[in-house]
Structures are given as C-alpha cells and as structure tokens.
Amino acid sequence: MVSSKQTQLKKGKQPSWIEMYLPKEVRPYAHLARLDKPIGSWLLAWPAFWSVALAADLESLPKMLAIFGWWAVWIRGAGCTINDYFDRNFDKKVERTKSRPLASGAVSPAQGLWWLAFQLFIGLGVLYQFNVLTLALAIVHVPFVFAYPLMKRITYWPQAFLGVMISWGALLGSSALKGSVVPSIAYPLYISSFFWTLVYDTIYAHQDKVDDAKAGIKSTALRFGDATKMWISWFGVGCIAALVIGGLILNIGLPYYVFVAIATGQLVWQIFTVDLLSPLDCGKKFVSNQWFGAIIFTGILLGRLFP
C-alpha cells in the first residue's frame, strides 16, 4: 500500500507536518480539523483578537490572546468537521475536496461525529473561566457553525452567513473583558469583519465554481459571476468604513489610521490583482488575508499605545 506521504510526493506536494510527525491513526482527524492549514483559525481568531486588543489592558493581553487563539483553533476544527460531514457526498464530486477524510472514507461518519464532540468540548471548555454572558454567547455561536455548511444548498449567499458566524469573536472579546458586549468596541469590528468575510470567501469560492455548479452547490462566486470584482470592491469599502468609524468613536490614536490605510492597500491589491479564473491565485489571495488581520491588530495596539 502506498503511504499518504508517498502519494503526496508523487503528486509533487511536500508532506505536511501531519504526515511527518503524527501517528498514522491520528492523521485523518488532524486533516479533518485542517490543522495543517491554519488560515481558517486565523480568520476566526482575528475579530476576537481585535476586540481583545481594544478591551484588554497590556498585562492581561497575552493571556487573553492565548485563550481566544485556543478557542479559534478548536472551533474552526469543529466547523471543518461538521462541514465535511454534511458535504461528504458532494466533496466526492469536487477535485479539490475528494480526498478529504470523510469523503474518501478514511474516517467514518460516526467517527467524525465523535471527533466533532471532542473538539467542541475542548474549544468551549476554555471559556468556562469567563462570565456567564460570554459562555452563553459562545454556546449560541455553535448552531451557526453547524448551519453554515447547509447554507450552500439553499442560498447563493452562504458567504454572508459565514460572515455572521466567523465574526462572532468581536462580540466575545469585549464580553469576556468588560462583562457585556460593548457596542462601541464590538459592533464596528463585527460589521467590518462581516464585509471582510464577503470579500475573501467570495474569492475563495471561485476556486471551486465549476465543480460547485455541477454539484448544485451555491455561492456568491456563482451569484456574482463576471461582476464579482465590483461586488467585492463595495464589500471592501464597507469593511474599511466600519474600521474608520470604530476608530473615531473610540478616539484611537493616529497610528491606527496609518495601519488601516496599509490594510486598505492590501485589500485593494487582493481585489484588483486576483485572477478569478485561476484556482491557484484565488487560493493565494485568500490565504493573504491573515496579513490583513495582522495589520489591523497591529494598528489597534499602536493606536492605543500612542493615542
């Protein structure tokens, strides 16, 4: 039998750290949680990190970032697992996804559900140290995580639902530190993250648009078609406008706006240079969004340090 490492080498791919360092029995579960592809965890974590950076004092900041980073890794893994569970029959028809553990049979549906329960337990467990509101918000978030994969079957706007779900950390960060969802902190960040998600996940959806159309999977990529760049340009405007308005409300220092300007340039670069006919380029532009999140986070910190 050819090992997964040998198969990857034959396809011209370098084996990930999962193949190199994890026991064979564990590898399918690590792949199911996309532990070798951290971009999804970053995208879930950044709204929480932004909110924490605005709400926390410098002494508590490292601990809070570690807690929400842990939460993001495991909840994102749970989201990938439930997505693959619901989509396992569709994934078999899509070139990019047919080798996923549930689609390929490396993990059975029952095993996938047990793995899902474990990830939710670990991800939510770390939040038990916070107030009741924060824990309640985290629990309310879970049905949105479960529902997202189903949206691709009923609407051409699943990316909007993803924006609602993946921006949740903006609410949790202020709640955990302030005891309530502080509107001046949480709402501008949530709105900005929502529009940002519409930009990057529409680009992401263009990778699979041909296979998705054949399989009956809906997306904004298929909805917008040749008008995609116009649509995501307006979403980008909404994202940046919310960040600027939030900064003005909180009276954040000048460095924040400098970094928002840099992030704007990064977003403009994505939108105007992405080749929507190239799955490879769409994937690269999607992954580059980890840097957009980092730029905004840096701007928030410096804006608070140098008001």
UniProtKB/Swiss-Prot annotation:
Identification of the protein by name: 4-hydroxybenzoate geranyltransferase 1
Known cofactor(s): Mg(2+)
Substitution effect: S219A: Reduces activity 85% and decreases affinity for geranyl diphosphate 5-fold
Result, substituting D208 to A/N: Loss of activity
Disulfide pattern: none
A single GO cellular-component term on record: endoplasmic reticulum membrane
One of the GO BP terms on file: ubiquinone biosynthetic process
Mutation effect (D212A): Reduces activity 99%
Predominant place of localization: endoplasmic reticulum
Induction text: Up-regulated in the dark and by methyl jasmonate or oligogalacturonide. Down-regulated in the light and by ammonium or 2,4-dichlorophenoxyacetic acid (2,4-D).
NCBIfam families reported for this sequence: ubiA_proteo (TIGR01474)
Membrane topology of this protein: Multi-pass membrane protein
Enzyme Commission number, as recorded: 2.5.1.93
Endoplasmic reticulum recorded as keyword: yes
